[in-house]
Amino acid sequence: MDSNLVNTEDTLVSVIKDVTTDFRGAMCIDSFSVEALLQAIEVYPGRPIINSISLEEYAPGVDKIDAVVAPTCKHDPVYIALATGPKGPAITAIEKADLAKQIYEKCHSKYGIRANQIIVDVNAFPIGSESDDDMNFAMESIKSIPLIKKVHPDLKVSMGVGNLTNGLA
């Protein structure tokens, strides 16, 4: 939840309090603001799912893993990890698996995050938006799944299938 119209930190906390009054399911907490995520996690009554972490730069010299995982890992959350690095989103299956490995290794070695706490989002791009005729974004995303499971069998994988057809209608 991010907006130029409201104070994200206050609004996200308010929404979580209101929604979780009668709701005990899992909730994915999403914000570009690390401060908003921290405040939201403090009031969330369950185990949060945090969207998202990656190896892309959050601030000069700080990637999103360090910015988000360091202050939130004490809450034992599940993290959605985007297959995105300093150069942007991974395109090929091998690039996606390589970034998943780097993300897992950094999260595990530096913060003690277990593989079953990470859901790798393979960043599915729309079919037909490839600039290279030999590239198939959908197949690259699908082919990345077993490669990511080879990194660690407990890593989970997600793919926004709605993204595959975005813009085709």
Task: List the predicted regions and their residue ranges.
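Short, acidic/small-residue loops that bind anionic groups at enzyme active sites
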Residues: 23-30, 50-56, 146, 151-161
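Glycine-rich, proline-tolerant flexible connector loops at the mouths of alpha/beta enzymes
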Residues: 1-25, 124-134
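Catalytic beta/alpha-barrel core
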Residues: 1-5, 25-33, 48-60, 115, ...
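Catalytic alpha/beta core domains of metabolic enzymes, predominantly
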Residues: 61-63, 72-169
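Glycine-enriched alpha-helix->loop->beta-strand junction motifs that scaffold or abut catalytic
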Residues: 24, 42-49, 73-79
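Generic beta-strand/beta-sheet core signal
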Residues: 1-6, 30-32, 51-53, 80-82, ...
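Distinct, well-ordered alpha-helical segments
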Residues: 8-16, 37-44, 68, 95-96
